Structures are given as C-alpha cells and as structure tokens.
C-alpha cells in the first residue's frame, strides 16, 4: 500500500519484452581498463533500471491497480550531467573541468561524464580493482585517491543496492 522505488538489474530477456531499443541501449562492450580487476566477459547485456511502483486506490481506499514505470540508466546521461552541474557548477582547474559523476553497473561505467583519451564518454570502462574490492566486495564507501580510466583523482564511491540490499553497482 505504499510507493516503492528501487534500482535493479534487468535481464536482457526482460528488456526485450519492453522493446528492442532498451536491449540495445543496455548492451555495452567492456573496454580493457588500466588497474581494473580481471573480468572474463567482453560485453554486458543486462541493464540497470531505476524503477517505481505506486498503488492506485478507489474511493474506499482499496487498491485497484498499480502504476509502474522505470528508467534504463545505461547510456542515459541526464542524471550524471545534472549531478555534475549541481555539485561542481562548471568550475575549472588549469582549463579542465573539475568533478565527474558515474553510475556503475557492477564495475562497469554505464552512465558517465568521465572522458577517455579521445574526449568521449568513457562508457564500457571499469573501476580500479582496489575500489572494486572496497565498495562492491566489502560494501564500504570509498573516499580517497583512485585511478579513474586514465588519470588519478580524489574520489568518492558509494554502493548502489537493489531492493533486497544486494550491491549491484556504485555511484561515483
């Protein structure tokens, strides 16, 4: 009888039921990344979705239905760009923008404004092994120096948990 919001990993088979475009957005090639833990897969095909459900009641407060919706976070830059704008306000240091934001699905960058050596969003790159161990394995926030794609940064990472409390990713 209450509204529920959660972040969940959605299998490709479920994304396909909603539309080919969602499954295509979720599919990411994994890019070899310096200092990342070994990973045998060369791609990710499941998606991370922010989902919500709210009861619909009649005049007698009886639940007669549910409003349900979700937003696929893979390749969706609205959240990371908005957070960057709010927190870092376009500040620069030595001509370079400071502050970056990433949503990780497990250890994989699925939404980010971190850029690679070509100046493109570093989608498909991975987190460093030491951050992986702290945040994804031990479930602890990380605050400190970390290697991000191709540079050292002062960073903060927080686990993203699904509705059951399982760690499914990170916010950087």
Say what each PLM segment does.
Residues 1-42, 74-90, 111-150, 161:
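Extracytoplasmic/periplasmic sensor domains and loops in membrane signaling proteins
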Residues 43-45, 63, 95, 149:
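Solvent-exposed loop and beta-edge segments used for protein-protein assembly and interaction
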Residues 8-10, 93-96, 100-108:
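Short hydrophobic alpha-helical segments used for membrane anchoring or interfacial signaling
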Residues 6, 47, 70, 99, ...:
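Glycine-centered flexibility motif
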Residues 44-62, 69, 100-115, 136-142:
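A short, hydrophobic secondary-structure junction motif
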Residues 47-84, 152-172:
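Conserved beta-strands of PAS-like sensory domains
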């Amino acid at each position: 009888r209450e509204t529920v919001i959660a972040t969940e990993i959605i299998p490709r088979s479920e994304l396909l039921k909603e539309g080919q475009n969602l499954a295509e957005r979720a599919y990411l090639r994994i890019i070899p990344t310096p200092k990342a833990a070994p990973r045998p897969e060369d791609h990710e095909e499941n998606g991370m979705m922010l989902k919500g459900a709210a009861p619909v009641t009649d005049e007698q407060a009886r639940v007669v239905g549910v409003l349900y919706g979700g937003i696929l976070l893979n390749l969706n830059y609205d959240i990371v760009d908005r957070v960057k704008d709010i927190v870092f306000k376009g500040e620069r240091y030595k001509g370079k923008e400071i502050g970056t934001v990433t949503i990780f699905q497990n250890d994989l960058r699925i939404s980010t404004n971190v850029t690679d050596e070509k100046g493109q969003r570093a989608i498909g790159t991975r987190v460093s092994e030491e951050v992986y161990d702290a945040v994804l394995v031990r479930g602890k926030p990380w605050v400190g120096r970390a290697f991000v794609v191709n540079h050292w940064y002062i960073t903060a990472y927080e686990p993203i948990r699904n509705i059951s409390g399982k760690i499914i990713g990170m916010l950087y």
